[in-house]
Curated annotation (Swiss-Prot):
Annotated ranges, domain HTH HARE-type: 19-88
Molecular functions per Gene Ontology: DNA-directed RNA polymerase activity
GO CC term, one of those recorded: DNA-directed RNA polymerase complex
Residue stretches in coiled coil: none
Function: Participates in both the initiation and recycling phases of transcription. In the presence of the delta subunit, RNAP displays an increased specificity of transcription, a decreased affinity for nucleic acids, and an increased efficiency of RNA synthesis because of enhanced recycling.
Protein name listed in UniProt: Probable DNA-directed RNA polymerase subunit delta
Chain segments carrying region Disordered: 125-200
Domain of life: Bacteria
Amino acid sequence: MRRNALELEVFAGQEKSELSMIEVARAILELRGRDHEMHFSDLVNEIQNYLGTSNSDIREALPLFYTELNFDGSFISLGDNKWGLRSWYGVDEIDEEIIALEENDDDEVAPKAKKKRVNAFMDGDSDAIDYNADDPEDEDAYEADPALSYDDENPDDEKNEVEAYDAEINEIAPDDLGEDVDLNEDDDEFSDDDAETSEE
């Protein structure tokens, strides 16, 4: 036999079968008051006792109820699956409550060990090369060789690049082209008359 000690005055005169679980949850939390938040399972048990529903009916309704509890703006999760009414807390107070709960969780959690990556395609093949195993960039202590990096602040890098570029140009271009070449800038321009002739 179920205990039905909880009576909610808000629903006096209404058929319990017509009430939604979310309405009953709100009324239960309002009756309990601030500083009496409830764990989800306790809240569900209170709702079940008040409505007098069977275990199978409650189990069937749980996914919808949990979704409504999350999306209904009047409820707030305080961590550890503990629920309260949003109206109990000011905006700043909500952040403080959640942060305090997160800090308590951080104290209890041990640091996780770094996991070694496993290549599923190697299957113990001794001839296979594991390219992930010898990648120096994967190591935390890896530092790039400063001689191989390009530094924007170093003018010697730019000077070396210019000298290398000039050397390449001198290899390609003959030395006697220097001053004898006249560039006719008019030849390089494309006039409107040329455009009309090329289209026809």
